[in-house]
């Protein structure tokens, strides 16, 4: 199916980036934690447990009184939400006919009870759903959110809940003198890529280590003389001092070589790391001999293949520090 453009933004709620379903009022038939699993939902006919057919999703009991069912998700990457997907895959006679989505921004780590007492902002009003379908809803909001609440009307099952958006890091939680300028959780984002046949380039800058090959970025095999690449807008203008190119899990399909280029406008590029040989299944760390200010990074791999993670350690410039802090303040006020 053709997906909206905003679905290319990272999933801020995914378990892979630290998201958590902190509460649900009911999960009799299927657990709430399934909502944010990064894998696509599965269905195994004739797999029955003590409560009936086993579903890969969140499913509540049939309501016999007025009301709705709800689940609260703590975003692994707080940020600006551009859209949500309520995926009812494999729920046919038991999907909710309607859903709505709200959000809240709060410091610290409040309990479910404390969260429920807050004033929530509507991102998606009560809207009709289709069964066994991805139901996308674009969100128009410029605020930074930390928690999202999914309400289903009146009950039923949802396989996955995706919250796409742009991460906005809290500068109070970072040492702005030295950190990963290319980290998704700090506000970096992929702006372009030559190929994403096997997996998304967003994986390159995701938190933590890749646990399997599928959690990295892998391109199709090239049959021409070109090479693959990905471009990233960094968390802020900075001066990098160390690059990490991680090919963990990629053995017969790692790139043979890679290079890094930098830019202050995303158009004119200069060399950061010359074309350098890579080894399969290896974390490579390269000190950068002549660090320069940059706000964009381009990774070229030769000729194709896969990479688990890309890190770029350094400090923000004065302008980068100012823009980083202002972005957070602007997203706080919306």
Regions found by a protein language model. Name each.
Residues 1-70, 74, 166-235, 251-253, ...:
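Disordered, acidic Ser/Thr/Pro-rich linker "stalks" and the adjacent N-terminal cap
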Residues 50-54, 110-137, 203-222, 269-288:
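Intrinsic, low-complexity N-terminal interaction/targeting segments
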Residues 78, 120-157, 227, 238, ...:
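Beta-sandwich interaction modules
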Residues 79-90, 150, 239-249, 299:
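A short beta-strand element within beta-rich, extracytoplasmic domains
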Residues 87, 102-106, 164, 246, ...:
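Predominantly extracellular/luminal cell-surface or secreted proteins
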Residues 94-107, 253-265:
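Short, surface-exposed beta-strand/strand-loop-strand elements in extracellular ectodomains
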Residues 152, 220, 249-252, 258-334:
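C-terminal functional regions that serve as terminal interaction/effector modules
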Residues 158-169, 312:
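Short, structured interface segments
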């Amino acid at each position: 199916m053709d997906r909206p453009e905003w679905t290319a933004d990272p999933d801020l709620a995914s378990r892979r980036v630290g998201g958590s379903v902190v509460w649900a009022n009911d999960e009799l038939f299927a657990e709430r934690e399934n909502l944010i699993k990064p894998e696509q939902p599965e269905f195994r006919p004739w797999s029955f447990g003590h409560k009936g057919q086993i579903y890969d999703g969140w499913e509540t009991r049939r309501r016999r009184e007025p009301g709705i069912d709800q689940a609260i998700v703590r975003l692994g990457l707080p940020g600006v939400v551009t859209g949500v997907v309520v995926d009812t895959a494999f729920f046919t006679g038991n999907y909710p006919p309607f859903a709505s989505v709200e959000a809240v921004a709060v410091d610290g780590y409040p309990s479910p009870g404390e969260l429920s007492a807050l004033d929530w902002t509507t991102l998606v009003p009560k809207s009709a759903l289709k069964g066994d379908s991805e139901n996308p809803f674009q969100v128009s909001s410029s605020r930074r959110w930390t928690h999202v609440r999914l309400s289903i009307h009146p009950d039923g099952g949802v396989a996955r809940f995706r919250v796409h958006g742009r991460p906005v890091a809290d500068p109070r939680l970072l040492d702005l003198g030295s950190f990963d300028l290319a980290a998704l959780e700090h506000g970096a984002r992929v702006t372009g890529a030559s190929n994403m046949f096997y997996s998304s380039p967003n994986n390159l800058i995701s938190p933590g280590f890749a646990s399997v090959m599928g959690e990295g970025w892998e391109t199709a095999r090239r049959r021409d003389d070109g090479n693959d690449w990905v471009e990233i807008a960094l968390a802020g203008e900075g001066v990098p001092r160390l690059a990490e190119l991680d090919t963990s899990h990629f053995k017969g399909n790692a790139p043979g070589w890679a290079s890094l280029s930098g830019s202050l406008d995303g158009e004119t590029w200069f060399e950061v790391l010359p074309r350098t040989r890579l080894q399969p299944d290896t974390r490579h760390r390269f000190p950068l001999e002549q660090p320069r200010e940059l706000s964009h990074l381009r990774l070229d791999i030769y000729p194709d293949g896969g990479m688990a993670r890309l890190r770029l350690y350094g400090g923000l410039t004065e302008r980068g520090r100012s823009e980083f802090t202002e972005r957070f303040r602007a997203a706080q006020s919306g």
